[in-house]
Amino acid sequence: MGFFDKLKSTAVNTVSSSVSSAARQMTDKARHGVQDAVNSAVKSVGTKRESFKFSSLPQSLEELQALPEASLDTPYKTAALAVLALCAYTANREAGTEMLNWLRGPRPMNGQDVSFLNDRFRDGKTYLPFTYFSGSTPDNGYTPTQPYTLVIQSDHTSNDEAGYMKLFIPCGGADAPRPIKLRQRGSDGKWFLWEQYLLTGVQLPKEQDPWA
């Protein structure tokens, strides 16, 4: 091969290599761009916030069932009523139990469930369910603003399990919202309380905190 042929071959190879490298870079950027878009879409799917306002808190199952949210046709409504039922339980265990059992549908509480609730509310911790109302803070002893307002929210993991919905409720005594899980009944589409993680520890009310 002559000198000029070698020079030509080298030039062609160099150009080809540069073009291939540029093409790979463009492909990588495109791939990353698509992946970023997919990740963003996944994160946004199912993200929703619903707010519920109550002029007063129900003291009996009949009062709970009289609320519009008692249709139980969305998991958000059932989650909101679960907080109200827990509040009622702190004042009247019998009434609160009736409410919770109704919200649980075909799976009423057993002895272990009742023992768990009683244990959570020991030592003056009856304020726990009230920490989920807007305006409740450690400084004001978790006293909600009026009307009683609850925010229920979902995220991209909420409907990972078919027939269930995991929602989250912001808490005035914790940095992150607390989860609650609902299950849908196939026969009528209504949503019922399945699991709740709303009674875990929160920051002590100021009047109970010796270090405040």
Model-derived features: positions:
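Core segments of small alpha/beta cavity-forming domains
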Residues: K43-S134
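Beta-strand-connecting loop/turn residues
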Residues: L7, G163, S187-G189
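Surface-exposed, charged secondary-structure patches
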Residues: S115-G173
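Predominantly extracellular/lumenal beta-strand repeat domains
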Residues: R31, S51-S55, C171-G173
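Glycine- and small hydrophobic-rich membrane-insertion segments that are intrinsically disordered
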Residues: G2-S51
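Short beta-strand edge/turn micro-motifs at domain boundaries
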Residues: P170-W211
